[in-house]
């Protein structure tokens, strides 16, 4: 079993992200050839939050995924378990509410948010189903979940090339651009170990989310899952 199996130690994963925090965003841009910015924009579009609504961004890291909500004047809370990542985010965007916390035990009351999102972070959670259930708990009735995560390419030949890139090229590139290249070996292994689009959709439904759907990005390199909490979202006065 690889170190990136679903049986993870949260303290070890958090420490790993502490190490990569200073160069995290730059390295991600390099490794994705600039695609991470586009994927994050699509997450914001899928959330579709409007002024007056409150958004929880789980596994927000340095806050790059939270910035568009803050820039739009929304009330966004950026939560992460890596103090190193939060430190970088707070220094860059002091206007965003950064909170240290565990995705499997969210420090919020029931029905606190109009939408909850997690971008490229669910793989790093020790108990992803428990985290999905916690996100459901803190979402208001009628509220929305959006999950962006690396997934499984749908075209066979591309899947083969992608696997080769993950296990060989990605760690080599990270060795030149990251402060902790071994973290990107973990990244490659965790992507390979992650369930495919349909299985993740089933996980989301299993914990109680409704109307689960997903959209493939870049041929399934990334999948954008969306779901709703049963009930009706109250309109703001």
Swiss-Prot record:
Biological pathway: Quinol/quinone metabolism; menaquinone biosynthesis; menaquinol from 1,4-dihydroxy-2-naphthoate: step 2/2
One GO BP:
menaquinone biosynthetic process
MF terms in GO: demethylmenaquinone methyltransferase activity
Q: Which domain of life is it from?
A: Bacteria
Record-linked SUPFAM superfamilies: S-adenosyl-L-methionine-dependent methyltransferases (SSF53335)
Q: Where does S-adenosyl-L-methionine bind?
A: 62, 80, 102-103, 119
Q: Which reaction does it catalyse?
A: a 2-demethylmenaquinol + S-adenosyl-L-methionine = a menaquinol + S-adenosyl-L-homocysteine + H(+)
What is the enzyme's class at the highest EC level? Answer: transferase
Output the InterPro entries linked to this UniProt entry: SAM-dependent_MTases_sf, UbiE/COQ5_MeTrFase, UbiE/COQ5_MeTrFase_CS
PROSITE patterns membership: SAM_MT_UBIE (PS51608), UBIE_2 (PS01184)
Per the UniProt record, which EC number(s) apply here?
2.1.1.163
- Keyword annotations of the record: Menaquinone biosynthesis, Methyltransferase, S-adenosyl-L-methionine, Transferase
User: Belongs to which family?
Assistant: Belongs to the class I-like SAM-binding methyltransferase superfamily. MenG/UbiE family.
What does the record give as the function of this protein? Methyltransferase required for the conversion of demethylmenaquinol (DMKH2) to menaquinol (MKH2).
Q: What is this protein called?
A: Demethylmenaquinone methyltransferase
């Amino acid at each position: 079993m690889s170190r990136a199996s679903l049986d993870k130690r949260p303290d070890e994963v958090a420490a790993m992200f502490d190490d990569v925090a200073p160069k995290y965003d730059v390295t991600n841009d390099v490794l994705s050839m600039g695609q991470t910015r586009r994927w994050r924009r699509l997450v914001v579009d899928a959330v579709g939050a409007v002024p007056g609504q409150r958004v929880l961004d789980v596994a927000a890291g340095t806050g790059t995924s939270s910035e568009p909500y803050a820039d739009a004047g929304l009330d966004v809370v950026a939560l992460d378990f890596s103090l190193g990542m939060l430190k970088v985010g707070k220094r860059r965007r002091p206007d965003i509410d950064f909170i240290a916390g565990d995705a499997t035990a969210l420090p919020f009351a029931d029905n606190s948010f109009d939408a909850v999102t997690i971008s490229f972070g669910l793989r790093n959670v020790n108990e992803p189903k428990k985290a999905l259930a916690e996100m459901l708990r803190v979402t208001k009735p009628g509220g929305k979940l959006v999950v962006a995560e690396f997934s499984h390419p749908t075209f066979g030949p591309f899947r083969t090339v992608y696997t080769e890139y993950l296990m060989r090229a990605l760690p080599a590139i990270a060795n030149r651009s990251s402060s902790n290249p071994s973290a990107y070996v973990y990244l490659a292994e965790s992507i390979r170990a992650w369930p495919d689009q349909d299985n993740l959709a089933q996980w989301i439904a299993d914990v109680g989310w409704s109307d689960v759907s997903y959209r493939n990005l870049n041929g399934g390199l990334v999948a954008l899952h969306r779901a709703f909490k049963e009930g009706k979202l109250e309109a703001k006065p």
